[in-house]
């Protein structure tokens, strides 16, 4: 029996819950207690909705639709539901037209998302093993040391001619391939710098279990530095220009 089915069975004696719904759209991560709480239902036929406490099975809120939004490009309408009046932390079900969907209210509700977003960069590291201590089942051997890289004819200059061998280890894989891009990763670093400048206290506290965790430097800065070191190797010392990418030949 899966978790969803179990919850429905436990609460069945108090409240008849509907089927898990793909019609109802809400914040899957949850809501802060004092935050606005809105859901969207992919139909214009909603007369009432109910919020049920998952722990007790009690109805804690019933409301009418806020408004119906008609699509300018189709004959479909969507109903907006507002349940911002619920502020108590806990797990709940939103019930609409016989369907239901679970959600949570708690402080720091988006912290898991922030942690996962930062940790994803560690998984993209090249040139070092991604160890089970930090990656669990996503561990893997080191990929692409990039300590012997050939300058492509399109990137050759007066000093560094085509075929020159350089070392350019580290950095992040761009996506599902083996390429490393200056522009793409520099954009990511720019966002990291901007958000750290705005919320330094948050990132001083954040720990996402990477090899550098606990070194008295925020994990965000450590992860950013891992790619910055690689970016420095992508600069042509003769003219200061920066190569666009490091990639396989084909």
Where are these regions (language model features)?
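Catalytic cores of eukaryotic secretory-pathway lumenal/extracellular enzymes that build
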Residues: 52-54, 60, 69, 117, ...
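Sec-dependent signal peptide recognition
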Residues: 1-10
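Low-complexity, Pro/Ser/Thr- and charge-rich linker/hinge segments at domain boundaries
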Residues: 23, 101-137
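Hydrophobic h-region of N-terminal signal peptides that target proteins for export
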Residues: 10-18
